[in-house]
A protein has these predicted regions:
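Intrinsic low-complexity, intrinsically disordered or marginally ordered coil/linker segments
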Residues: 1-188
Length: 188
C-alpha cells in the first residue's frame, strides 16, 4: 500500500466485549483461503463478520495479528491502512462492540501524526522529532526542547516555535539530514 498510515489502538470496554472482539479478530487473522489478499483486507472481513457492509465503511487495511493482545484489561493492536486512520471502521467497531477505541496514527509521507487520547492515558506523546534521541516521541515540551538543543546547539529553547526555528536553522547547514519535527495533533 502506498502512503500507509500506521495506527496503534488501545480499546477500553467491558471485559466480555473486549474478549469477544479479540476472539473474532483472532479467528479472522488466519485467512480462510490462505491468500495474501484476504489477509490484507482483514478490516473489511471484520466488518462483514459483524453484519456491516464494507462498501459503506472505509475499511481498507489490516491489523497485524502478532500485535493483538490483552494487557491490564485493555485490548491492544496495530493496523496498517491506506492514507489515514480508518475512522469509519473505528466508529463501526466502537458501536458494534460497545467499546471505546483510543488511537495514535502516523503517516510520515504526509506528516500526519494524530491521537484521540486527549488525556494521554494510552498515547501520551505530543511531539515527534527524529533528530537525535533513541526515541522520536516526546511527552513534554521540556523533553523536546532538551533534545532539539542537544542536536542544534541552541540554548534557551522553551516553546515548539523555538524548536522549529532551531531545527530550521540547523537544516540550513545540514541539508542531507532527513529530520522531522512535528506536534502530534489531538482530536476528539
Amino acid at each position: 500500500m502506498a502512503n500507509i498510515a500506521y495506527t496503534e489502538y488501545a480499546v477500553e470496554g467491558q471485559t466480555d466485549n473486549l474478549l469477544r472482539l479479540k476472539q473474532l479478530m483472532d479467528d479472522l487473522a488466519v485467512p480462510s483461503t490462505g491468500s495474501d489478499e484476504e489477509l490484507s483486507n482483514s478490516l473489511d472481513r471484520l466488518v462483514t463478520a459483524t453484519g456491516g457492509n464494507p462498501s459503506e465503511i472505509e475499511c481498507r487495511g489490516f491489523w497485524k495479528p502478532f500485535t493483538l493482545r490483552m494487557e491490564n484489561g485493555i485490548l491492544l493492536f496495530e493496523v496498517e491502512s491506506k492514507w489515514v486512520e480508518p475512522s469509519q471502521w473505528r466508529a463501526f467497531i466502537e458501536k458494534t462492540f460497545n467499546v471505546r477505541m483510543f488511537y495514535y496514527t502516523e503517516q510520515l509521507g504526509e506528516l500526519i501524526l494524530k491521537t484521540n487520547d486527549a488525556k494521554g492515558c494510552h498515547f501520551p506523546y505530543r511531539y515527534y522529532f527524529n533528530g537525535s534521541s533513541d526515541s522520536p516521541y516526546f511527552e513534554t515540551i521540556d523533553e523536546l526542547c532538551e533534545d532539539v538543543g542537544e542536536l542544534t546547539g541552541e540554548e534557551d529553547l522553551s516553546t515548539f516555535e523555538d524548536c522549529s526555528k532551531a531545527v530550521s536553522n540547523y537544516l540550513h547547514n545540514h541539508l542531507d539530514e532527513p529530520i522531522i519535527l512535528s506536534q502530534i495533533t489531538v482530536t476528539i
